[in-house]
């Protein structure tokens, strides 16, 4: 059974649909303080009003504050507005409290009257109409000062809506606490996810069916989208009519009227009030409960053996998500001319974001994120000012501006999509930790015909496996993967090892999807103190190499051996250097500069603490990571042909963006790492910043750099840790070309890169 929360609909048949209303920016300076408990206020002449959230939506529970007074909707000025006032607005809409408020029409400018100015609340009022103000319609503000709020997701239990306004809005103040798809037919009751059944809404604590008399396929599309499904499909209505005729139903007294492009049922208009039949007193005497049947995306369709119907099959997508911790979220990237690039967040909203989600096989968008909240991309910004109507099959079918002047990667758009409830979070738990985001990993597995909780063998346990656990639990990224957990007292009834040999690729949605030994448990060290553990965090770093700089700075140097004593000691040279004369010999070095950016949402810190760092006498500083980057020269079949290069590193902030302060430095035993928005530079002329190619024959090669190769430190994206170039060496000169980051090309373009036989420019011709 699927359940989700939606918010108060305050609507009129004569006013515009709420689908066009909403908000976007988040202001930390107006972040939520704890909301005061509402207390009874002295009785006075307080007018009855309605409140709604308007503007371009990036989340359904935020927007420009609009008030319905004396038959007209109007806005509220931001002068003297406070978190107390924001709490009152959200409570009036049925939410427990506010998260933040935003001034200066950040949700867009409203129209018509500005009803309230200089609003002064103490946090205990029942309505914003009870707060102090200049009086109704008394203001010197313009709509550029319209205020907006963001409410929490938590609803007030049993919240009752006032229906005391006369006129057209009478009876249309509907509170829908939750909505669900309740599987009715036996064929769907045990299936995960639930894709077909009655649409039911929870009103004042009771579940009620929705009458199908005014139900449309557009309504079904919205409901399916809320539950993580990209589309609706037809179903056998005769079976449901037969079932309904044998049951007594309690109906919701209203109908919904959706356009089909809403990201949430809360954005639909109320269609009308269902009048009870005078004879039967039933509100849906000529109908039956509304039914939806949804098509799941490919990743969520049950296996063919279950007899499941057809699943939604999207074509090869021209859009992808990167940098998100959970399935269905990430920075939006689009493919153009064989190269992936980002999109600018100008005009980015829920409707447009929902097109992306559905294109990828998810439901509608839960949240449209602006300001690179899923990390910054690299390369081109392919699209900006995108405007969709919500029914496009692909983002590229929407109207957009191909020019991105004024945009930078700090404005990269991202999305969180609604995904089906698969129940994966119920199959794993963390036990014994100091807080809910850490602990010994315990999994629910079938052993000897029964389901039982047990531990995971840590012999093959690493960061990638820990990442899957954190994703499965919805806890973000893994900050650490522990192979010993003796300090965490787990459940004594779950001490036995029930899973071993776990190896994950990083794309799985649950630990059970990773390769493992199944029922053949093989754990030489046993469980107990060697059971696997994790620690999860909300954000992670993302290291990316500047590929263009590598291509621009590459050159060869013949360096005498007597100048390479320190490098020789640190094994930065090929093993043949041991046989080279220290006085007359030399080494041929492929030199280049590297610039490693942290484009993520958290600082990159070494895995080990300062007590484990190694002092390098030649360089006169500590190296915090012995294996931070690999520099490799490969033959065209992928064989390594050169050895001798920099291995251990000291990590620091060499340079930063203008608004970012340096935090890490190698000097004076300082803290090491790379701050978000900073980069660590290794110039071409520093010791060991090379590959020793003395023994390499002339020919065509691949040059490859891999950052964090052992994945010792968790990152939001490992695909961009690899940089690869084509390379031609004629015995005297070297050419580096087509340098690019892993994942920046389409599959087809990458294959052409792998098989391209020569360099096409005025220096060397194609063979």
From Swiss-Prot:
Disulphide bridges, residue numbers: 77-141, 90-151, 121-131, 211-284, 224-294, 258-268, 344-407, 357-417, 388-398, 457-523, 470-536, 504-514, 566-618, 572-688, 650-666, 656-678, 725-739
Binding site for Ca(2+): 542-543, 715, 717, 720-721
Protein modification: The lysine tyrosylquinone cross-link (LTQ) is generated by condensation of the epsilon-amino group of a lysine with a topaquinone produced by oxidation of tyrosine.
Residues bearing carbohydrate: 281, 448, 637
Gene Ontology CC: basement membrane; chromatin; endoplasmic reticulum; extracellular space; membrane; nucleus
Annotated binding of Cu cation, by residue: 619, 621, 623
Residues found modified as 2',4',5'-topaquinone: 682
Highest taxon in the source lineage: Eukaryota
Record keywords, A-Z: Basement membrane, Calcium, Chromatin regulator, Chromosome, Copper, Disulfide bond, Endoplasmic reticulum, Extracellular matrix, Glycoprotein, LTQ, Metal-binding, Nucleus, Oxidoreductase, Repeat, Repressor, Secreted, Signal, TPQ, Transcription, Transcription regulation
Family: Belongs to the lysyl oxidase family.
Protein known as: Lysyl oxidase homolog 2
Organism encoding this protein: Xenopus tropicalis (Western clawed frog)
Lineage: Eukaryota, Metazoa, Chordata, Craniata, Vertebrata
Gene: loxl2
